[in-house]
Amino acid sequence: MSWPVLAAVAAGGALGALARAGLLAATPQHPATADWGTVLVNVLGCALIGVLMETLTRRPNPHPLLRPFLGVGVLGGFTTFSAAITDATDAFAAHQPGEALLAIAANLIGALLAVSAAAGATATLLDRAAQRKKT
């Protein structure tokens, strides 16, 4: 991996982590329960990666640092599945197994649905825009 790519990932990761910290600070947190702000961050981040990847695959020559910066860096730093599992572990330890399992399911299923729906919606919008350009 080249130094410019590493720098792009590092800069993007810092921005993504700061955005996550800001969003998590703005969401209510309750002790001994799963952190639903983490679910929000992961689902939103996965939706954005769906938009990004669909957009980049349709560009003829995207800048070589765009995907490392935005995808791996910003969105990789924004999402946090390790924190989601830690939150679920904390909920289990607090004798809240239902909350823990619901949070795990919300993170995993929500993320899969978000990336799929966002990529599909982006593809539809880009196809419509391309059709309008032709007419």
UniProtKB/Swiss-Prot annotation:
Belongs to the fluoride channel Fluc/FEX (TC 1.A.43) family. This is Fluoride-specific ion channel FluC 2. It is a multi-pass membrane protein. It is found in: Cell membrane. Fluoride-specific ion channel. Important for reducing fluoride concentration in the cell, thus reducing its toxicity. The keyword Cell membrane applies. One of its GO terms (biological process) is cellular detoxification of fluoride. The chain crosses the membrane at residues 5-25, 36-56, 68-88, 100-120. The gene is fluC2. Keywords: Cell membrane, Ion channel, Ion transport, Membrane, Metal-binding, Sodium, Transmembrane, Transmembrane helix, Transport. Na(+) binds at G76, T79. GO terms for molecular function: fluoride channel activity; metal ion binding. The keyword RNA-binding does not apply. GO terms for cellular component: plasma membrane. PANTHER family: FLUORIDE EXPORT PROTEIN 1-RELATED. It catalyses: fluoride(in) = fluoride(out).
